[in-house]
């Protein structure tokens, strides 16, 4: 069987992690099939039996050309006649094949959010939420299967696209096991209670919820609120509206801006903290939640489906309704006296083996 894999835009962040996990799965479960992997320049291309790599340029408008006509032209030039096309980049392509499998991991396309049209993020959200689903529909057919990471994404995608649920498989991604013995203790400011929120400065990450929450905490227990420190993986100025609110309400001492933090240091900070705060309203998975739970760190998060699914079985999570700032403040104050919990371990799941079965045999196998 000839299988083509599309990964030309999987060169950074979470998409690159997924691609690397796929390569490991390919080495173990690729079988005797003929694999053609299409990648961007500079991406990992380890030597694996029966695997050939092809470098393609698909940035910007070239991506659309590739999806609709470019890929079809390339495989014709190379004399490749695919039986299966597996896409790691959320959409399919136009070509002849017996089966198409799409790995979908873009929550913005299926989640409603009230966006401030003046924000830097507005164009990104409007593109992914309104245009992207239309684009996806143009590149799926009755031979298409879709792989997702959580049931939340499965249900949302099925509803958004009108796509049959029985052709969507759920494959929880592999998460790196943390060696706690290698994590050094992080020294926070003495006589303070330190919380951490590792997130990028996108509007839907709802950092400002934490500013409102700390302000509410002062109304409930001002002496304890003075000792609260919220550590952010942002630089001052990345979220001007929040910066202004913090300044106007005299909360400067409560917020610590660290900028980008190396992952190992971040894990040390999470382990040594009094709790992980996670007010984000749009997530495909929410990896920091899993990392905090695996360290036994208390978690305060929005009462949303993705949080319940990811942290199902963890005793150390407290849920708060979205935008209930008074309750957020109360939970943060309560967490100041909380101890750590028993570390949470995910149940074993042979997700990549199951996904490879979908690619090679067209079978959706539940865990």
Predicted segments — roles?
Residues 292, 298-301:
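Short hydrophobic beta-strand element within catalytic cores of glycosyltransferases
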Residues 124-146:
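Membrane-proximal helix-turn-helix segments that form the acceptor-binding/catalytic region
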Residues 281:
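Aromatic "clamp/platform" in nucleotide-sugar-dependent glycosyltransferases that forms part
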Residues 317-326, 334-337:
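Conserved acidic donor-binding segment of nucleotide-sugar-dependent glycosyltransferases
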Residues 4, 187-205, 211-214:
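Conserved donor-binding/catalytic core segment of Leloir-type glycosyltransferases
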Residues 242-264:
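Nucleotide-activated donor-binding/catalytic signature segment of Leloir-type glycosyltransferases, i.e.
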Residues 141-181:
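Donor nucleotide-sugar binding/catalytic pocket of nucleotide-sugar-dependent glycosyltransferases
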Residues 37-42, 227-243, 259:
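Glycosyltransferase donor-sugar binding loop
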């Amino acid at each position: 069987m000839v299988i083509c894999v599309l990964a030309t835009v999987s060169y950074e962040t979470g998409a690159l992690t997924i691609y690397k996990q796929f390569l490991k799965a390919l080495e173990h479960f690729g079988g005797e099939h003929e694999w053609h992997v299409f990648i961007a320049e500079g991406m990992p291309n380890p030597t694996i039996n029966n695997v050939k790599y092809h470098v393609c340029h698909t940035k910007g408008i070239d991506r659309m050309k590739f999806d609709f006509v470019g890929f079809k032209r390339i495989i014709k030039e190379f004399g490749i006649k695919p039986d299966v096309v597996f896409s790691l980049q959320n959409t399919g392509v136009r070509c002849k094949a017996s089966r198409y499998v799409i790995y979908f991991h873009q929550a913005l396309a299926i989640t409603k959010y009230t966006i401030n049209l003046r924000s830097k993020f507005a164009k990104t959200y409007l593109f992914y939420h309104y245009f992207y689903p239309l684009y996806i529909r143009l590149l799926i057919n009755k031979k298409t299967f879709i792989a997702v990471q959580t049931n939340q994404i499965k249900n949302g995608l099925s509803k958004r696209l009108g796509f049959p649920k029985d052709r969507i498989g759920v494959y929880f991604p592999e998460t790196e096991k943390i060696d706690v013995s290698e994590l050094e203790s992080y020294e926070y400011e003495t006589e303070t209670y330190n919380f951490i929120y590792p997130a990028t400065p996108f509007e839907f990450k709802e950092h400002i919820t934490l500013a409102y929450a700390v302000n509410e905490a002062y109304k409930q227990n001002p002496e304890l609120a003075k000792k609260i420190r919220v550590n952010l993986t942002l630089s001052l100025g990345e979220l001007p509206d929040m910066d202004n609110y913090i300044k106007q309400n005299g909360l400067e001492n409560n917020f610590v801006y660290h900028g980008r933090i190396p992952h190992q240091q971040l894990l040390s900070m999470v382990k040594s903290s009094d709790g992980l705060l996670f007010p984000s309203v749009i997530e495909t998975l929410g990896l920091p939640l899993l990392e905090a739970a695996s360290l036994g760190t208390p978690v305060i998060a929005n009462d949303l489906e993705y949080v319940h699914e990811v942290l199902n079985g963890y005793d150390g999570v407290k849920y708060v309704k979205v935008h209930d700032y008074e309750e957020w403040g109360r939970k943060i104050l309560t967490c100041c006296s909380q101890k750590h919990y028993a570390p949470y371990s995910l149940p074993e799941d042979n997700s990549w083996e199951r996904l490879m079965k979908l690619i090679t045999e067209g079978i959706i196998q539940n865990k």
